[in-house]
Amino acid sequence: MTGDDFAVALDKIRLRLGTQNFDLDCTFPQGQVTAVVGASGSGKSTLLNLVAGFEVPDFGRVVIHGQDMAASDPSERPVSSIFQDNNLFAHLDIFTNVALGVSPGLKLRAEDRQRIEVALARVGLAGFDKRLPGTLSGGERQRAALARALVRQKPVMLLDEPFAALDPGLRAGMTALLLDLHAETKNTVIIVTHHPDDIKKLAQRVVFLDRGRVVYAGSTADFFATQNVKAVDSFLNG
């Protein structure tokens, strides 16, 4: 493996959480969208947590842009995360929620404020600065979370089923927005999803997990043509 080939690598990772063992060895190409897929409990969120630094492997390395992350706290890693519940602070307006992505202490320069306004406009939330999260729809809250990730300007974005709570119309809108933003930023996106349509529309590659192990890692086209892998067949055909 060379740093030119991938943005993120889980290099011979071993981790035990409770009674479950995880053995993860896979890479995520620079500038591509990779879908992480598998049944409930297969290790999808654990994989993201390892990349983000919320879980520490018992053995092996997490490598991001050629750097071993062993000594890097989550706040020091070049990643932004978006979760299903969007993690917005209910008592803070949307501008302030997004501003936390720039400065946790809210020490903002004029250029920081401009960057926040640009991000809000880019996700379709211009004029929402003073609104509280509770006054927004589910799709609007996810757009605010995406704006917060954008202002962090990190090269790797982790998304843990960010559209799961949205209806089909909102899902389609968020999918289109994510594609547009990826075309602009060229960042590396790792998205956990259980929707085959999301995989087809968003991802160039797929990593499929089964009981804590990688059983497929390759192109999206080849994934949907995979045969004789029971876990993949169950996912694709119910």
From Swiss-Prot:
Entries under Gene3D superfamilies matching the protein: P-loop containing nucleotide triphosphate hydrolases
UniProt-annotated binding residues for ATP: 38-45
Subcellular location: Cell inner membrane
A GO term, aspect molecular function: ATP hydrolysis activity
Superkingdom to which the source organism belongs: Bacteria
Pfam families noted in UniProt: ABC_tran
PANTHER family: SPERMIDINE/PUTRESCINE IMPORT ATP-BINDING PROTEIN POTA, THIAMINE IMPORT ATP-BINDING PROTEIN THIQ
Protein's name according to its UniProt entry: Thiamine import ATP-binding protein ThiQ
Organism lineage: Bacteria, Pseudomonadati, Pseudomonadota, Alphaproteobacteria, Hyphomicrobiales
